[in-house]
């Protein structure tokens, strides 16, 4: 409940920043978001579970984004268990980093990185090694430098033999070279890749959470506007794949 209270408090800040971007009808839903909560409980009332509430469902709402992330993380966990058991696959977690950019370049850079990602996953080596993936764009904000870092988190399904078969295995160094090549940015110094040995809650939450942290995008109106514009662009591009 403490986490919910914190998110609800941030919703008050969110209302001020989102107002210029939505119509009055949507704004009414945002103002009333989660003002009604219905719980189910056991006989002792010691264990309670949220049963129903009125949600605005805006992707930037701190409460709705938090609740959706928890739900999506559970969905990913169940999906992974099913694929491991029924398809006999394993998973790797890949993070593709990029240089920081200013607000005015964020939109164009995300569009370019989205294109680069699609290009990389059409490479013969990657097609042979991967059996499916889920990706998520995350944007973080550096307050001291006033710039943004867009990067991709990618959950990739691979054959069990991937880790021992040299024909298909892609090392961290090779992932880095591929990412540098498709982006054309030799300054990229690292990518992170690791085998998921079990359903790691931290990695699943990274995949499930929204593209930005509310602690970042609710700093001020300027930062919020940059996140809002750029994340809408990414959603549109991703839907076109």
Per-segment meaning from a language model:
Residues 204, 224-227:
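Intrinsically disordered, low-complexity regulatory regions
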């Amino acid at each position: 409940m403490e986490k919910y209270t914190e998110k609800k408090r941030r919703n008050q800040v969110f209302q001020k920043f989102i107002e210029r971007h939505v119509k009055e009808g949507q704004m009414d839903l945002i103002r009333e978001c989660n003002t009604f909560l219905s719980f189910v409980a056991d006989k002792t009332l010691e264990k309670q579970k949220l049963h129903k509430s009125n949600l605005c469902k805006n992707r930037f709402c701190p409460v709705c984004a938090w609740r959706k992330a928890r739900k999506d993380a559970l969905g990913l966990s169940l999906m992974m268990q099913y694929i491991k058991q029924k398809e006999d696959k394993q998973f790797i977690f890949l993070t593709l980093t990029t240089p920081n950019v200013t607000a005015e370049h964020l939109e164009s850079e995300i569009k370019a990185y989205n294109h680069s990602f699609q290009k990389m996953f059409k490479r013969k080596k990657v097609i042979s090694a991967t059996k499916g993936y889920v990706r998520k764009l995350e944007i973080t904000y550096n307050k001291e430098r006033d710039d943004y870092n867009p990067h991709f988190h990618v959950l990739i399904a691979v054959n069990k033999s991937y880790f021992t078969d040299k024909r298909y295995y892609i090392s961290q160094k090779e992932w880095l070279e591929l990412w540098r090549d498709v982006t054309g940015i030799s300054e990229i110094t690292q990518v992170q890749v690791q085998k998921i040995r079990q359903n790691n809650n931290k990695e699943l939450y990274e995949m499930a959470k929204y593209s930005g942290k509310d602690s970042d995008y609710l700093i001020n109106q300027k930062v919020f506007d940059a996140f809002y514009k750029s994340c809408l662009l990414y959603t549109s591009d991703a839907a076109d794949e």
